[in-house]
């Protein structure tokens, strides 16, 4: 019989709509200003921590809607953002640097919806407010470090083999040249070094020289490593900042986008994200006197560095250990109430420190603080020129064999100790980064964007509904119900997807898909009217109308989906957000227009004697 659906299709349609409605509902309940407390490096908060939080809030007379321990994290909800900020300050001072106290917006979803993991959509920066940074990795410094490593490695190999050389000089494109006493030594060096350094192209040059340059594959690998490692380290630093639902992702070859929703202290964010501080541990060369050091007369294996007081210190160039091996660091005070930083190393770092210190007991070891800072100058491309600043913050005699844990002193004040411990805990950047773009969106503007976005959606929906009802009567009402169902399904699916974030371009995508859904219904209704004018019966006209319009609707939507997939693949940020909502909307509009409206039409007219249609 024409225009009848089997029962399972109706059941499927009802189930899909109900599920979509359930997962769309949390978006109506809004969010509470909240403070989220988590342990550093994955340590779970305990019942004792919960009691401490509750006690602190009571003592400071800060009213909380609720304070709960959930999945190893404490979530305290408040009525206003002012109360939220007061609570964060109070809890940070009490809990110290063992916990991350993050500002958050916690969904006010009822328990029965939370039980089925129904959560509201994640809002993008333009809707929620916050700060956006576009950062550029300083590839010149990253590859320069690799060049230095190659120089040290080749020098070490030549000394190990006993091949004499006179000078080592840096060359263009991060290469290097080594000068030997004669051609025999040069040829021997080439034969020895080539199989040991597959990532270098080593060639003979005139004047008893060899030249070594990195292969294109090695340079590409180094660039990729610098960006990826910086992304990982920035994510760690964002966690230390205490930001909920941040975005840290790559953009292009050497740029990184960082978005921090709800952040209010932008100066602090820039300070932590852009900081390039790390530590180097080196042995002090005690064979050079102060006068020679001040005059810069030092051996080739040493160099002069300054203390914070401006005193010269001669350090060996060989770095015993860098901040890369630091797994944890905390700030505290020593027995003299002076600030110190307690450092824990990974197993490899612990072995290096242990093996070195056992052979050098009684010798002085210096802690060198290394940082890149903006010089205030610009290069030819208008980018800030960074300068490397190094200062000796601590010199101590090695009194015993050190292991995985030790402490450093000589730090000016407790704030600096906390800052240094935070940076070391998060990890040192592989290469300096520059903030090339910064945008701040206030919470008020975010709310305004939400309001305008909702108004745009509702206006588009109302105009479409009026148009459909005016032109297609009862079939227009059926199409209207499909439009509403389409919007519910889009919101429900967006809420279900863990990585989906709704932004202003995403709202534009939703408005666009509502237009696409209207277009599909227009095609179907016009085809039915055409079949009726050709003398078909009502049942035949409905059947032929849907069948005839299907190919046009399907082809149009498939081409749109192809474009959306391409946008998602090559786009970033806002473009991806637009692609996601448009793709979801196209799929749901096909479902509601072809299956949803047909189900309603079949229920109303299927298998019945109908002589006239309201269309």
Swiss-Prot record:
InterPro entries: SecD, SecD-TM, SecD/SecF_arch_bac, SecD/SecF_CS, SecD_1st, SecD_SecF_C, SecD_SecF_C_bact, SecDF_P1_head. One of its GO terms (biological process) is protein targeting. It holds the Pfam family Sec_GG. GO terms for cellular component: plasma membrane. It comes from the Bacteria. One of its GO terms (molecular function) is protein-transporting ATPase activity. Keywords: Cell inner membrane, Cell membrane, Membrane, Protein transport, Translocation, Transmembrane, Transmembrane helix, Transport. Gene3D superfamilies: 3.30.1360.200, 3.30.70.260, 3.30.70.3400, Multidrug efflux transporter AcrB transmembrane domain. Its main location: membrane. The chain crosses the membrane at residues 10-30, 452-472, 477-497, 504-524, 546-568, 585-605. It is a multi-pass membrane protein. It is found in: Cell inner membrane. Forms a complex with SecF. Part of the essential Sec protein translocation apparatus which comprises SecA, SecYEG and auxiliary proteins SecDF-YajC and YidC. Belongs to the SecD/SecF family. SecD subfamily. HAMAP family: SecD_B. Part of the Sec protein translocase complex. Interacts with the SecYEG preprotein conducting channel. SecDF uses the proton motive force (PMF) to complete protein translocation after the ATP-dependent function of SecA. This is Protein translocase subunit SecD.
């Amino acid at each position: 019989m024409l225009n009848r659906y089997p029962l399972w299709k109706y059941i499927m349609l009802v189930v899909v709509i109900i599920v979509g409605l359930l997962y769309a509902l949390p978006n109506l309940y809004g969010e509470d200003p909240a403070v989220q407390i988590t342990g550093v490096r994955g340590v779970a908060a305990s019942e004792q921590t919960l009691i401490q939080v509750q006690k602190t809030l009571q003592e400071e007379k800060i009213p909380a809607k609720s304070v709960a321990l959930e999945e190893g994290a404490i979530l305290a909800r408040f009525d206003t953002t002012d109360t939220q900020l007061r609570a964060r300050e109070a809890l940070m001072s009490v809990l110290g640097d063992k916990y991350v106290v993050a500002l958050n917006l916690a969904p006010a979803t009822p328990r029965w919806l939370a039980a089925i993991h129904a959560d509201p959509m994640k809002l993008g920066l333009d809707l929620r407010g916050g700060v956006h940074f576009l950062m550029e990795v300083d590839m010149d410094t990253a590859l320069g470090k690799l060049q230095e490593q190659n120089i040290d490695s080749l020098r070490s190999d030549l000394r190990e083999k006993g091949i004499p050389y006179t000078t080592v000089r840096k060359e263009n494109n991060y290469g290097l040249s080594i000068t030997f006493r004669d051609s025999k030594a040069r040829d021997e060096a080439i034969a020895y070094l080539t199989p040991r350094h597959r990532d270098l192209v080593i060639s003979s040059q005139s004047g008893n020289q060899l030249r070594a340059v990195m292969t294109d594959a090695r340079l590409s690998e180094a660039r990729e490593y610098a960006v990826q490692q910086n992304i990982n380290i920035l994510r760690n630093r964002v966690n230390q900042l205490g930001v909920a639902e941040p975005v840290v992702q790559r953009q292009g070859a050497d740029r990184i986008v960082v978005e921090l929703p709800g952040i209010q202290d932008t100066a602090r964010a820039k300070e932590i994200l852009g900081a390039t501080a790390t530590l180097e541990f080196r042995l002090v060369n005690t064979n050079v006197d102060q006068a020679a050091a001040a005059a810069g007369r030092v051996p080739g294996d040493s160099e002069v560095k300054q203390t914070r007081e401006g005193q010269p210190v001669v350090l060996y160039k060989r770095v015993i250990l860098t901040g890369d091996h630091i797994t944890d660091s905390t700030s505290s005070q020593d027995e003299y109430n002076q600030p110190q930083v307690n450092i824990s190393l990974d197993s490899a770092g612990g072995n290096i420190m242990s093996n070195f210190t056992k052979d050098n007991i009684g010798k002085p070891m210096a802690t060198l603080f290394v940082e890149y800072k903006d010089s205030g100058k610009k290069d030819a491309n208008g980018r800030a020129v960074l300068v490397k600043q190094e200062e000796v913050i601590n010199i101590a005699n090695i009194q015993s064999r050190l292991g995985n844990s030790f402490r450093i002193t000589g730090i000016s004040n407790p704030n600096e100790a906390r800052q240094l411990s935070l940076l070391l805990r998060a990890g040192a950047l592989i290469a300096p980064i520059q903030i090339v773009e910064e945008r701040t969106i206030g919470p008020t503007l975010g709310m305004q964007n939400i309001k305008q976005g909702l108004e745009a959606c509702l206006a588009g929906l109302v105009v479409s509904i009026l148009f459909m009802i005016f032109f297609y009567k009862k079939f227009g009402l059926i199409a209207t119900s499909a439009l509403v169902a389409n919007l519910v399904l889009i919101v429900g699916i967006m809420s279900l997807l863990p990585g989906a974030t709704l932004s202003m371009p995403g709202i534009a995508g939703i408005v666009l898909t509502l237009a696409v859904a209207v277009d599909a219904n227009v095609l179907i209704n016009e085809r039915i009217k055409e079949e009726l004018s050709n003398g078909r019966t009502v049942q035949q006209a409905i059947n032929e109308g849907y069948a005839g319009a299907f190919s046009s609707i399907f082809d149009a939507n498939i081409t749109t989906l192809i474009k959306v997939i391409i946008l998602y693949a090559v786009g970033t940020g806002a473009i991806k957000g637009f692609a996601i909502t448009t793709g979801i909307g196209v799929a749901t509009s096909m479902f509601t227009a072809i299956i949803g409206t047909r189900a309603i039409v079949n229920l109303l007219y299927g298998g019945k004697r109908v002589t006239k249609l309201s269309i």
